[in-house]
């Protein structure tokens, strides 16, 4: 029995033994996913103006000259700027949090995370909301005083594509070799010996460099803070090109800003989610957070930048209300779960135990109160509704802005299944009792 099998036999963490197909699949993702983002870039920001059909016709007709003319160029100074952006966010992540002193109910400062499968407890400096505010104040002031243009991101978006890909792969290889040579928490490592699987899915659970947890940092700081700045740059570029900002652009920015601010306001809650509490840090997170997130999650604003859509008042209100309903479901479910962890008075739950790899039995509870008694993943249901609202704001002329809600639905359904497999291993008979009490995953009576 190899070390990986030995480790997984007593651990409720990741225990999948990859097959040849798994290794080939992860190898394909590792090598070809950047080209998917490049295609998104060409269709959304090139002369195709969001038309997948026109792009497809150029491929069929062999018009490679037109396609090639839309491929962005690489600029070394843009790579330097992207690296400085990450360093700047790293500096902000090290500052002590002060926002919790002024913002009601906000939890900031040094806080404990989730107990890892090997029994380690990691602490995080929760100051994302502070970093978000400082960054936006500095960027807005810099634009106001003319230090750089408010369209600077979109003016260099093509070069940024190449730069963040380089950075994403550099971080991936750093994480891989760090895990092999000086792991922060070796007992939580999952090394399978399958090269691409280990690189893509990650070996280390909580890699730290200079006291900073790379998983939380890259999950939240460079990409999600940039998300809103990218949207704002798209809006300013739309204004520059057309002389106004469409109400559809405003709607997308508002709905996504609500989601972004919610993420940072509830960063202390986020450290207990799947991304932080269960996933290992490899290419999937390193490249995903530096490339997939900023380019995939901003497709709506990018599409509207070149295709201004003026929504009717009725449709605007309908999409806005839909987005708010989705957000309320998402936030209420997560709030209830977080609240019930600390105060179980009047809460319906199944008391249970689980064992970590160090052999200790630990107490926990499976809650079926509130929305968690309606379905097992109502937070995901709300997330999908909100994601769909972003896309509906872009009208119905082209499919490309709808990629996001399709992707999020697939992501959250597969994540739901992974969650439940993990919970079944972790809680055993208690999980079976829970699924009998709450039989539906997303939508009561349907699924």
Swiss-Prot record:
Disulfide pattern: none
Keyword set, alphabetical order: Cholesterol biosynthesis, Cholesterol metabolism, Lipid biosynthesis, Lipid metabolism, Membrane, NADP, Oxidoreductase, Steroid biosynthesis, Steroid metabolism, Sterol biosynthesis, Sterol metabolism, Transmembrane, Transmembrane helix
Molecular function GO terms recorded: 7-dehydrocholesterol reductase activity; NADP binding
Catalysed reaction, written as an equation: cholesterol + NADP(+) = 7-dehydrocholesterol + NADPH + H(+)
TM stretches of this protein: 24-44, 71-91, 102-124, 133-153, 157-177, 244-264, 281-301, 309-329, 393-413
Main location as per UniProt: membrane
Catalytic activity, EC: 1.3.1.21
Membrane topology: Multi-pass membrane protein
Protein name from the UniProt record: Probable 7-dehydrocholesterol reductase
Organism: Acanthamoeba polyphaga mimivirus
